[in-house]
Amino acid sequence: MPHLAELVAKAKAAVEGAQDIAALDLVRVEYLGKKGHLTLQMTSLRELPAEERPAAGAVINQAKQEVQEALNARKEKLESAVLNARLAAETIDVSLPGRRMENGGLHPVTRTIERIETFFGELGFSVESGPEIEDDYHNFDALNIPAHHPARADHDTFWFDATRLLRTQTSGVQIRTMQEQQPPIRIIVPGRVYRNDYDQTHTPMFHQMEGLIVDRDISFTNLKGTLHDFLRNFFEEDLQIRFRPSYFPFTEPSAEVDVMGKNGKWLEVLGCGMVHPNVLRNVGIDPEIYSGFAFGMGMERLTMLRYGVTDLRAFFENDLRFLKQFK
């Protein structure tokens, strides 16, 4: 088999010349396939004398093994080249800025509500809630607001029909609570309320917090002490605070509470007063035995004062540039 060495040399050259796996497989078929050159060498053994066949077969098998080893080595090299090319294409440029992880944060109004709930919770107040679609009895009548009161006008209130409306205050929850519970009562009522108004300091929907205590021997002194402590805790300052006489149908006497701003001007922060005897009677509580005080405040207004926000509407515009300041 003088040309066997030449076949092996040609096969190895073809193997090295293969530039991809498909071309390499063609070389394998050409030399080691069923009709390959080296396979045909094995079939030609029958032409040799019997005593020469073993030695010739060993030589052919050695040649086939050399070609197979060359094929394996070339295949491994080509596969490695393909993998390296893919890895190079997929290489991560560590110098590029990564994706920012955006952490959520509480809305500033939510922060205010939670801060107030925490303060009053430590004083033994429980948190109550009620329907936002209210009837005129709980929103007006039971709160000593007569039919001719301006608050019932269409331009101030969103009415569904003659008796149902979007609540204009959370005070209706006070009525429901007093109807269901006997004194002593100590609650706060956070929630959304609705009024037909929209400008820099008013929105059609805003958040309000009501507070109510009903018990024996509750006085205006208790009211003042509670609100003094609350405001100084909320603003984290020893503020100058004043109570101005005011009027609310559901409290008597009534007052509005102001704090001294950094500009030397008084800023109104909330309204309050002693629960009107008529309100207590409307819910079946004897005003000769029990008394109470109530207060109400706008969450957006307190948030504006605490954080120095000048436009109420910013709380509702979902501008992340604004909201991220409160994380």
From Swiss-Prot:
Domain of life: Bacteria
Catalytic activity, as annotated: tRNA(Phe) + L-phenylalanine + ATP = L-phenylalanyl-tRNA(Phe) + AMP + diphosphate + H(+)
Localization (cell): Cytoplasm
GO cellular component: cytoplasm
Residues in the signal sequence: none
UniProt cofactor note: Binds 2 magnesium ions per tetramer.
Positions annotated to bind Mg(2+): E252
Keywords: Aminoacyl-tRNA synthetase, ATP-binding, Cytoplasm, Ligase, Magnesium, Metal-binding, Nucleotide-binding, Protein biosynthesis
Enzyme class: ligase
Cofactor(s) this protein cannot do without: Mg(2+)
Disulfide bridges in this chain: none
GO MF terms, alphabetically ordered: ATP binding; magnesium ion binding; phenylalanine-tRNA ligase activity; tRNA binding
InterPro entries, per database record: aa-tRNA-synth_II, aa-tRNA-synth_II/BPL/LPL, Phe-tRNA-synth_IIc_asu, Phe-tRNA_ligase_II_N, Phe_tRNA_ligase_alpha1_bac, Phenylalanyl-tRNA_Synthase, tRNA-bd_arm
Subunit and interaction comment: Tetramer of two alpha and two beta subunits.
Entry-linked NCBIfam families: pheS
HAMAP family membership: Phe_tRNA_synth_alpha1
Family per similarity comment: Belongs to the class-II aminoacyl-tRNA synthetase family. Phe-tRNA synthetase alpha subunit type 1 subfamily.
Name this protein carries in UniProt: Phenylalanine--tRNA ligase alpha subunit
Organism classification: Bacteria, Pseudomonadati, Pseudomonadota, Gammaproteobacteria, Enterobacterales
Gene it is expressed from: pheS
